[in-house]
UniProtKB/Swiss-Prot annotation:
Transmembrane segments: none
Protein name: Imidazoleglycerol-phosphate dehydratase
PROSITE patterns named among the record's database cross-references: IGP_DEHYDRATASE_1 (PS00954), IGP_DEHYDRATASE_2 (PS00955)
Any single biological process term in GO: L-histidine biosynthetic process
Pathway annotation: Amino-acid biosynthesis; L-histidine biosynthesis; L-histidine from 5-phospho-alpha-D-ribose 1-diphosphate: step 6/9
The protein's Enzyme Commission number: 4.2.1.19
Pfam family, one: IGPD
Parts forming coiled coils: none
UniProt similarity note: Belongs to the imidazoleglycerol-phosphate dehydratase family.
Originating gene: hisB
Keywords: Amino-acid biosynthesis, Cytoplasm, Histidine biosynthesis, Lyase
Subcellular location: Cytoplasm
First-tier enzyme category under EC: lyase
CDD domains per record: IGPD
Length: 197
């Protein structure tokens, strides 16, 4: 049974299409109009081994906020759809990923309960490239978590270069999601004593 989620989201601010295959090979076809964000979504696909298509048209003449937020919301909804009833998955996972001087530590619970804990070094430069506001990283994960209905802890204890601080977070999230979404042949049904997630 394929685990594919497809979501289309349209507002007066953005038009978003996302398709994700949880059992993919890391193939990615991504275009949001925000170069660094595209680069981060490629990390999710590559290191999560998710086949990911993202097409976003947004009001970039204002700024990139709506584009990144709505893409993350659609991505979370697509993950939720692809997971189905969550039967047979590992559910919990964690990952540590370094990128030179920066380190990200991520723990995920595919719990049905949206919750984000996020911390990164303070005092980062406000922009990466011309259009990625570094304060959006937390908001991107908040938006994703809200729709995916997962619990996500992201901690960057140290790092100096903003590009590295952000990128190692996306890579670690990808690796943790990959492990948490994997099917475990020993798990029968939903991995919860409640019987539902």
């Amino acid at each position: 049974m394929s685990r594919i989620g497809r979501v289309e989201r349209a507002t007066n601010e953005t038009k978003v299409f996302v398709e994700v295959n949880l059992d993919g090979t890391g193939a990615a076809d991504i275009s949001t109009g925000v170069g660094f964000y595209d680069h981060m979504l490629h990390q999710i696909a590559k290191h999560g081994l998710f086949d990911l298509t993202v097409r976003t048209e947004g009001d970039l003449h204002i700024d990139a906020h709506h584009t990144m937020e709505d893409t993350a919301l659609a991505l979370g909804a697509a993950f939720r759809e692809a997971l189905g009833d969550r039967s047979g998955i590992r559910r919990f996972a964690d990952a540590k990923v370094p990128l030179d001087e920066a380190l990200a530590e991520v723990t995920v619970d595919i719990s049905g309960r949206p919750y984000l804990v996020h911390s990164e070094p303070e005092g980062m430069a406000p922009m990466i490239g011309r259009d990625y506001d570094t304060t959006m990283t937390r908001h991107i994960f908040e938006s994703f978590v809200a729709q995916a209905r997962i619990t996500l802890h992201v901690h960057v204890p140290y790092g100096r270069i903003p590009h590295h601080i952000v990128e190692c977070q996306f890579k670690a999230v990808a690796r943790a999601l990959r492990s948490a979404c994997e099917r475990d042949p020993r798990v029968t049904g939903v991995p919860s004593t409640k019987g539902t997630l």
